[in-house]
């Protein structure tokens, strides 16, 4: 005869599994709609400190886009990386032109070191809100310095409003 305690444990275990799966999908779907609703360019930063300060106000869905210009490549100089704001040292996404794997790996190594270096002259840092589970091709926004500053100001104003709620 089966142990009744074991049956109860199995039932509770199944209920817990189903509950965790439902929770996962609920937050996954919510995250999707929040991200799609807020999919906007938030500006370009000239220093890691400025970027980090802003990112602290918006943890979660926001990704940092590091746009590196390689002087050796005159035709197409951009190699783009997305890194989650909560784990800035872990590269998660690479978007580069075909046949540029070596260049991409070189930049990937540089990203891992960028927080230890004071000089980031060749880097432009911008912030996008994106849906983190969709690994489609994304690129850094093309903004002028004035547009970038305006976008950052708007972003900081919005962040201030949200923080005061």
UniProtKB/Swiss-Prot annotation:
Induction: Expressed in the late phase of the viral replicative cycle. GO terms for cellular component: host cell membrane; membrane. Belongs to the asfivirus F165R family. It comes from African swine fever virus (isolate Warthog/Namibia/Wart80/1980). The keyword Transport does not apply. It is found in: Host membrane. Keywords: Host membrane, Late protein, Membrane, Transmembrane, Transmembrane helix. It is a single-pass membrane protein. This is Uncharacterized protein F165R. Signal peptide: none annotated. The keyword Transmembrane applies.
